[in-house]
Amino acid sequence: MLNWLKKLGVAGYASILGAVFSLVAMIIYIVNSTTGYLAGSSVNALPIIFAILAILLFVLKVALPEKLQNHWLDSFILLAAVVLLSVSICVFVDARTDVAGNQWFIPGMATDAQGACLSVAIAGVVFYVLAVVAAIVAGFCGTKKKA
């Protein structure tokens, strides 16, 4: 059953990690945007949509290693995943700048709820960055082990 997993190269494992990190980051973004300090605010759907698209691109890279090997689409898939995840990071950070400003630079405005919100947001951004790093690593390695 897991023979396909044994045949994966470094890029295959990095792509799986990238998909998992993207999923975790997306879940953190949704939780951070809908609970706690930001419970009543509107949620920007771009990071959610872009994370789902990046996950689908990672799955495509792992599912079709023979067809994408030495093809320009292989590089394009990873480039698109990096761009989508980078835009997600930018939107995520942009939506949390007021919380970070209140917490770090205006001592009278800092609250425990904002501190918790900011801590969770930082964890989400870290997972997005880890997904980007996984995509970059996958770009420099082979998806399938050489026979």
Residue positions per predicted region:
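Loop-to-transmembrane helix junctions at the membrane interface
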Residues: K61-A95
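Alpha-helical transmembrane segments of multi-pass membrane proteins
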Residues: V20-V31
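Transmembrane alpha-helix entry/boundary detector in multi-pass membrane proteins
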Residues: L8-Y13, Y29-L56, D74, A121-I122
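Interfacial non-cytosolic loop connecting adjacent transmembrane helices
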Residues: S33-A45, S88-A123
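Cytosolic juxtamembrane helix and N-cap/initiation of the first transmembrane helix
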Residues: M1-F21, V137-A147
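Hydrophobic cores of alpha-helical transmembrane segments in multi-pass inner/ER membrane proteins
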Residues: F50-F58, S119-A138
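Cytosolic juxtamembrane helix at the C-terminal end of the final transmembrane segment
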Residues: Q69, T97-V99, L130, A134-A147
